[in-house]
Amino acid sequence: MDDTQSVFRLADLETCYADTDTWPDFNPTADRPLGNLPVWGGYDPSRSRDDASFVIVAPPLKEGGEHRVIARYKWLDKSYIWQAERIRELVGRYNFRHIGVDVTGPGIGVFEQIRAFFPLATPINYSVQLKTQLVLKAKELIEAHRLKWDAGQNDIAHAFLTIRQGVTDSGQISYSASRTSATGHADVAWANLPGLAAEAIGQPKGGCVVFIQ
C-alpha cells in the first residue's frame, strides 16, 4: 500500500488494526452482539459499479476512548428497499443512536425508507465544506489511534488510502477517491464518515453532535 498521495498515512492506519476477539463486550453471533451498548451507523450508496456500504461503529463510553468498527456490509446490485430492510434488521439487533446516510444521488431512496422506522436517521448532503469536516474528523481519530477495526478487514485501510486532497476551480480544498477493483471509490471509508459524524471535530467525548447541511 502506498500513502504518498493519500490524506491518511499508512503507519497511522496500521494502528487501527485490532483483534476483535479481545473485545469482551462484543459477541458477533449473539442476537444482541453488543447488548444494549449504543452504536452509530453510516451508509454510502452504490454508484455505477461500486458497492453500497454500511458500517456499525461502537462509540467510546469514556472521554478519549476508541471508536470500534463492529461490523461492515457491502451490497451490490440490491434495490434501495432491500438495503433498507437489511438495515431495519440491524436496528433490531443493535442500540442505534445515530445513522448517517449519504443522500447525494441514490442514497435518498434508502434514507426515506430508513427514516420510516428510525426517525433519528440523519441525511448527509455533501458540500465541499461538509466533506472536509468529515474527512478531518476521521483523520483526527486515526492519528490519535482512536479508531479500530478487525485486522482481517485490511480493505478498510486500503479504502482510506485512496482518499486524496484536491482543489476546486474556486480554490477550495476538496477530497475525492480514485476507483480500484478492491475498494471501489473508497466505499467503506465513505460509509465510516457519516457514522463518525456523530462526534464533532475536536470533541473527544463521544457525544452526539451531527453535522447537517
Identify the meaning behind each predicted range.
Residues A52-F54, V69, Y175-A177:
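Hydrophobic beta-strand positions in blades of beta-propellers and related beta-sheet-rich domains
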Residues K62-S170:
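Mg2+-dependent endonuclease catalytic cores in nucleic-acid-processing enzymes, primarily RNase H-like
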Residues P33-P60:
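Gly/Thr-rich phosphate-binding beta-strand-loop-beta motif of the actin/hexokinase/Hsp70
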